[in-house]
Amino acid sequence: MEANQEASLFLVKILEELDSKQNTVSYQDLCKSLCAQFDLSQLAKLRSVLFYTACLDPNFPATLFKDKMKCSVNNQQSKKIMVAADIVTIFNLIQMNGGTAKEKLPTSCHKVRKEEASFESCRSDAEVCSPTVCEPLNCELSERPFSRGYPTRQSSKCRKMDCKECPQFVPASEPNFLLGVSKEVKNRAASLDRLQALSPYSVASPQPCEMQRTYFPMNIENESISDQDSLPIGQGIKETFISSEEPFMVQSCVQKRNIFKEDFHNLMTVSPSLVGTTNKAEEDHGEPRSQKELHKPPFFNHSFEMPYHSQYLNPVYSPIPDKRRAKHESLDDLQASTYFGPTPVMGTQDTRRCPGRPSKQTPWPAKSWSLNTEEVPDFERSFFNRNPSEEKLRYPNSGNQTPNFSGPDRHPVYLVPKDQQKVLPAGYAVKPNGLKSKEIPSPVDLEKHEAVKKFKDKSISCTSGQHSSDTSSVGTQTEQHVLDPPKCKDLCSAGQAKYSDRHAMKHSDDDSEIVSDDISDIFRFLDDMSISGSTGVIQSSCYNSTGSLSQLHKSDCDSSPEHNLAKITNGVSGSKGDKCNRPENVHHSEEELKSSVCKLVLRIGEIERKLESLAGVREEISQVLGKLNKLDQKIQQPEKVNVQIDLNSLTSEAPSDDSASPRVFHAHSGSHGPKLENSPDWCCSDVSGSNSESLRVKALKKSLFTRPSSRSLTEENSATESKIASISNSPRDWRTITYTNRMSLNEEEIKDAGPANNKDWHRKSKEADRQYDIPPQHRLPKQPKDGFLVEQVFSPHPYPSSLKAHMKSNPLYTDMRLTELAEVKRGQPSWNIEEYARNTGDKGKLTALDLQTQESLNPNNLEYWMEDIYTPGYDSLLKRKEAEFRRAKVCKIAALITAAACTVILVIVVPICTMKS
């Protein structure tokens, strides 16, 4: 006792030390501290406990750590470091993830006692020892029976009688001491990937009441002292745990694999037993326990399923007809070996069955071989078509329990041949006191319902443990009256009453709820994903276990969490009538319902937040697409208008253009200018500055305001020189339209404008629109070349003809119309300041204000960077070409001179010479 209590307190001490040093000490230092303070066996024990606790979290990567627990290292120091690193890592994962696993961590003795009390209340009444019989800590270490109904560790009353059946610990020096393979039965499974039905893992022959244990238990309270890693064994522990019947066997991987080479199918399989409500009283009278443990129905999981018509699944060809194969309890056991760990089922895995009730198979029927309803194996059909009345013959009541079975009755229920006759009508349910006709569907239908209801109970993490194999049993509460009232702590009674008392009313509700909205489909999909884990097969809650919709009697929306919550509420209210004499169970079920509601609300809120974020992205994308479509339309329309304006202005006379072009441009700017001003995209430059706007957006804005600037050949000078309506990036002048031919007016406006805010933008846009309406006679005349020379400073060469053809359709080069019109009178470009000064003379001298108002010279303006394409080295190449051209000219001139001289000589000199001679 004292040694066990000290061991528990010792574990609590280590956990408290981890918690205190978690945020202050580094990972490496914490591992070193653990290695220095504790022995390997203690660290291995703590790792095992932390691993089982963390497996309660479905997001815990159990497979990674399980592989580490399998490996054996000969070097003790290396193993110690690995174990310490695993301890720190698992502890940090538990602390970060929170939830169930974090709540299970005992941080103090008081917390350990509280957890024990809660776990004691979760177990079935036949297995819980009275609080007055044992102390809390000792209850945890030595008095916990395993929840499947194999009390290898008995209460202190019965310790002396049954202590020989307790397992023996393996010493820590054993290399494979983390791999426990004994006959001790556990309730959960962290799979070692071996068939549980195989028995030759130990030397001694198995007893009928025992089952091969090849799985780690998943409940920390049920397995506080792990059988894999032991603390130093004291005399008190030896008296409790040393088994005289059979040693604790650990076999190598070669031996385990050799099993499959042998004739292991003919070996004896084990049969788990059922612990009834009268179990404790019979044990006190000394009746052998092996007689009572033969009433356990087989449980199975199809993680190791065989092909369709295997002889080992057929009772006719079964080599062991008198033994039942034990397989996994449920799909949870398979999930325990997956990456995400076991499903978050909070309660213990007790069967919570009473001996008088018709023991039935777990609500998980056969695995889905396919989605085709016709492709169902024979043993599955026999499973669905069986009758609980046969089970009554096979599994008797508590009043007429018999220690032995006849040979044919020992077959598992799912191996019963199809041709067995039904003893009772389908409308009758088996009860201990006789046959009762109930207004419910047949038990076969109920079993089909349960496969689906099982999903829903797990999807909200119901803590009552309703996934046990008796949830679809018809008789539930009648047998409970033989129990003492102080021991009625079964939290699952609400779920049992729910399934028994409201099948009639819920069946009609199922048919009415046919239509489900999108959010229900989302919830159902998420539930299926959370249930399936990483097994790769989504066991959809809309289907039954064979993947058949035709065999399903439930509506589609039955599996949604909203409907699930309503079912729980109805179940609790319906079960209150049967449990008026058990108020504490009602209280427990209400607390359980509240916790389930809280978890469901939190989950709904989380999913809603995710959906809101997705909805926001979708709205933004739709807005952006809509704006792009509008911009494309606005780009196409002004281009058509401006092409007509350019053609008219080039062919028409000046007086008609002076009167017509302002009207056309006013219509264009009035229709498109204010719209652009009010759109959100054009307002971003005031906040984010010059770097926030993309080049495309700036070009689009500029193009919409600069297209109408070409009037006619007479107004071409002032239009191209000013580049009207350019958009500057600074808030001061981004909408201020400046005309160099209206310097007196625009200079005052620029000075008085100051930093503009949102209120001034509409006013400025209207002013910009009014500027286009100014009659031409008020504009001051300018020299033709004055506007071009400023641009020619940073416009080294005109556009090539091939580039123009490509750029005419590109919205980034929408000011090409200006340069095209300018090329009519554009002279030779200026390459340096001397040429520029020589070409312009006095007219080329620009004031500081001129430089500020000219868009082509303003680095903050987009036109400064997008005016022309300048190729580096182009001027040197051009000068070389010019030099070659000059050289060719000189050569031509020299050739002409030489030819002329030769001609003169030949024509004049030669005849003269000939004449003289």
UniProtKB/Swiss-Prot annotation:
<dbReference type="InterPro" id="IPR055117">
    <property type="entry name" value="MINAR1_N"/>
</dbReference>
<feature type="region of interest" description="Disordered">
    <location>
        <begin position="652"/>
        <end position="679"/>
    </location>
</feature>
<comment type="subunit">
    <text>Interacts with NOTCH2; this interaction increases MINAR1 stability. Interacts (via N-terminus) with DEPTOR (via PDZ domain); this interaction may stabilize DEPTOR protein by impairing its ubiquitination.</text>
</comment>
<keyword id="KW-0472">Membrane</keyword>
<keyword id="KW-0812">Transmembrane</keyword>
<dbReference type="GO" id="GO:0030308">
    <property type="term" value="P:negative regulation of cell growth"/>
</dbReference>
<feature type="region of interest" description="Disordered">
    <location>
        <begin position="457"/>
        <end position="476"/>
    </location>
</feature>
<dbReference type="Pfam" id="PF22948">
    <property type="entry name" value="MINAR1_N"/>
</dbReference>
<comment type="function">
    <text>Intrinsically disordered protein which may negatively regulate mTOR signaling pathway by stabilizing the mTOR complex component DEPTOR. Negatively regulates angiogenesis. Negatively regulates cell growth. Negatively regulates neurite outgrowth in hippocampal neurons.</text>
</comment>
<feature type="transmembrane region" description="Helical">
    <location>
        <begin position="893"/>
        <end position="913"/>
    </location>
</feature>
<dbReference type="GO" id="GO:0032007">
    <property type="term" value="P:negative regulation of TOR signaling"/>
</dbReference>
<dbReference type="GO" id="GO:0008285">
    <property type="term" value="P:negative regulation of cell population proliferation"/>
</dbReference>
<feature type="region of interest" description="Disordered">
    <location>
        <begin position="746"/>
        <end position="783"/>
    </location>
</feature>
<comment type="similarity">
    <text>Belongs to the MINAR family.</text>
</comment>
<feature type="region of interest" description="Disordered">
    <location>
        <begin position="568"/>
        <end position="588"/>
    </location>
</feature>
<dbReference type="InterPro" id="IPR009626">
    <property type="entry name" value="MINAR1-like_C"/>
</dbReference>
<keyword id="KW-0597">Phosphoprotein</keyword>
<dbReference type="GO" id="GO:0031397">
    <property type="term" value="P:negative regulation of protein ubiquitination"/>
</dbReference>
<protein>
    <recommendedName>
        <fullName>Major intrinsically disordered Notch2-binding receptor 1</fullName>
    </recommendedName>
</protein>
<feature type="compositionally biased region" description="Basic and acidic residues">
    <location>
        <begin position="576"/>
        <end position="588"/>
    </location>
</feature>
<feature type="region of interest" description="Disordered">
    <location>
        <begin position="706"/>
        <end position="727"/>
    </location>
</feature>
<feature type="topological domain" description="Extracellular">
    <location>
        <begin position="914"/>
        <end position="917"/>
    </location>
</feature>
<keyword id="KW-1003">Cell membrane</keyword>
<dbReference type="GO" id="GO:0016525">
    <property type="term" value="P:negative regulation of angiogenesis"/>
</dbReference>
<feature type="region of interest" description="Disordered">
    <location>
        <begin position="337"/>
        <end position="367"/>
    </location>
</feature>
<dbReference type="InterPro" id="IPR039706">
    <property type="entry name" value="MINAR1-like"/>
</dbReference>
<feature type="region of interest" description="Disordered">
    <location>
        <begin position="389"/>
        <end position="410"/>
    </location>
</feature>
<dbReference type="GO" id="GO:0005886">
    <property type="term" value="C:plasma membrane"/>
</dbReference>
<dbReference type="GO" id="GO:0010977">
    <property type="term" value="P:negative regulation of neuron projection development"/>
</dbReference>
<dbReference type="Pfam" id="PF06789">
    <property type="entry name" value="MINAR1_C"/>
</dbReference>
<feature type="topological domain" description="Cytoplasmic">
    <location>
        <begin position="1"/>
        <end position="892"/>
    </location>
</feature>
<feature type="modified residue" description="Phosphoserine">
    <location>
        <position position="712"/>
    </location>
</feature>
<feature type="compositionally biased region" description="Polar residues">
    <location>
        <begin position="460"/>
        <end position="476"/>
    </location>
</feature>
<keyword id="KW-1133">Transmembrane helix</keyword>
